[in-house]
């Protein structure tokens, strides 16, 4: 027996997995765009960083301080978010965690909407009608999320907590994959910037 009362060599209880969305990007969403303009907007969004001066929620900071592994998507907004919460500690950048694409429907140029509405319709058409415009499709994104879930579960298997700084929708896909693997969601803060979803093994 060990000092904790567990048999020597016993498998440790897996740590938790916390999926956090990045902070608010610097790119302004206060515009109305055509489909073509939204494509350009999304490309800029994908390479852009964070709006300066943000303060992450105390709960997320606490999760990061107590975690054994901190991982971020390779997108700049996720990397900068991880830098804010890491406070100097090292973290891993993982390309597997980037956001699923948002190609807009091919609607005429007289249709102008906010980026938020374009994002909604783009995701709807991508999810239900396989509108991917030659980019990653739903099945491919779900397979990538399943691979990410397996890697995160492997990291947590030793008993250390894992925190991920990534993206709103792809975090949802990872969460679905984790639940299929027996993980239970114990915290869900919605879809706002810096929000978290926390998973534990029963």
Annotate each PLM feature.
Residues 25, 170-171:
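Short active-site segment of divalent metal-dependent hydrolases/proteases
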Residues 17, 68, 160-168:
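Generic beta-sheet signal
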